[in-house]
């Protein structure tokens, strides 16, 4: 069983913004990038504003919206930070949540491909923030190369 994961926020009742239908966004702490325009700077290392939650505790918290998820083809969208870093947590959550919930992920894809391969059969829908295809621009925004992103896009 996975340990609890650091979560910086849970936003319920997002409609057609963080996924199809009614969705709940679950944002994880930690990221592989340091984007100059980061939407969630409190998700970065060094900023310890999070609560550790188990997959079971998350399910207890969000299952109140099961009817909304079923009626709208909605579900849970994992974001962050970089949710691919929490593959074990997401796998366990998918295993225990209702099978008709849609599991989506908002990712920059700048992670080792082993994470992407692990999540391939877990995630129903990907929202990929590519930042920029030009590596020079990408590096100036994020502090890292986009080569891993390109390799992961080819895999998907």
Residue ranges of model-derived segments:
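Conserved AdoMet/S-adenosylmethionine-binding subsite of the radical SAM
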Residues: 63-67, 72-75, 79-156
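N-terminal [4Fe-4S]-dependent radical SAM core
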Residues: 1-50, 64-70
């Amino acid at each position: 069983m996975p340990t609890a994961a650091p979560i910086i926020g849970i936003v319920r009742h997002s409609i057609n913004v963080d996924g199809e239908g009614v969705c709940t966004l679950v944002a994880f702490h930690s990221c592989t990038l340091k984007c100059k325009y980061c939407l969630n700077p409190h998700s970065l290392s060094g900023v310890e504003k999070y609560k550790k939650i188990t997959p079971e505790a998350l399910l207890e918290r969000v299952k109140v919206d099961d009817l909304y998820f079923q009626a709208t083809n909605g579900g849970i969208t994992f974001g962050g930070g970089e949710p691919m870093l929490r593959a074990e947590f997401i796998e366990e959550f998918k295993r225990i949540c209702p099978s008709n919930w849609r599991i989506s992920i908002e990712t920059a894809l700048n992670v080792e491909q082993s994470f992407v391969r692990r999540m391939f059969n877990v995630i129903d829908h990907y929202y990929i923030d590519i930042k920029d295809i030009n590596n020079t621009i990408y590096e100036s925004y994020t502090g890292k190369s986009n080569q891993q992103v390109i390799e992961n896009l080819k895999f998907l």
